Amino acid sequence: MLKLILKNLWARRVRNAWLLAELILVTVLTWYITDPLFVLSYNQTLPLGYEPDGLLIAPIRSLPSTAPDYNKEEADSLHTMENMHRMLRKLRDYPGVQNAAPLVTFAFPGSGGSSYNTYAYDTLAIPASISYFIPHTGFFETFGFKTFEGKTLGELDNMDYQRNDLVVSADLLQILPKVGRLTGKRLFYNSDDDEKDTTFFSIKGVVEKVRSRNYEQGMYSFFEPQLNVRSKEVWNGGSFLIRLQPDVSEQ
């Protein structure tokens, strides 16, 4: 019986070879299509590091210079920031609004923009996604990040940041397990320009891992304070991040 089976298989070897080739091709194509879908589906189940439900984005706009009520004296950076903070206070007092913060950047969690840099600790390179925030404006509280290493979101918002200070995500400990606490540690950055000195950055606070997009597993997230905001940055792409109260619909 076995001899007969082998004889039949040999007689049909060409046809069987084509069937095997088709089976392999179908298997490869199925894997090629389903593997990315599986990865995307899995990534979407991972926590973002903040609560996206109840968050809205409202763009900041200015009157055109030809408008009757346009005031040229109000267009400088000082008056622009004063007016932005005035609008921010009004937003927070609006019924149904829990908190609000200005976003004068293209790079923040959930945005379509992105900014990246590579820092270093000792000899270890650390690629990171950079988000920018204005201190003392409720950025961390409005997003609702998860705190780490003791500081509250309010404390992270209201620290007196200096140039080259950073807030980082706790997943950095995965590659720096021996440092203990991240707060207080220093990273450095070497520019490609040989004429520039090494720049050092101080870690002032830590939040849990943040993913900028729900379809990505994400990378290390760093938050850099914006200490000098110009008026054109506010009007060209500035917006308000608004968090609604839990019982208020986004519709």
What are these regions (language model features)?
Residues 116-149:
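The feature marks short, hydrophobic/small-residue-biased sequence motifs that occur predominantly
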Residues 67-83, 126-130, 160-164, 177, ...:
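Solvent-exposed, non-transmembrane alpha-helical starts
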Residues 87, 93, 170-171, 195-251:
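"Rare, low-scoring activations can occur
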Residues 12-41, 50:
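Short, strongly hydrophobic transmembrane alpha-helices
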Residues 1-10, 87:
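A short amphipathic helical element positioned immediately N-terminal to and/or at the very start
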Residues 96, 126-131, 141, 151-167, ...:
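Beta-strand-rich non-transmembrane domains
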Residues 34-126:
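Membrane-proximal extracellular/periplasmic loop immediately following the first transmembrane helix
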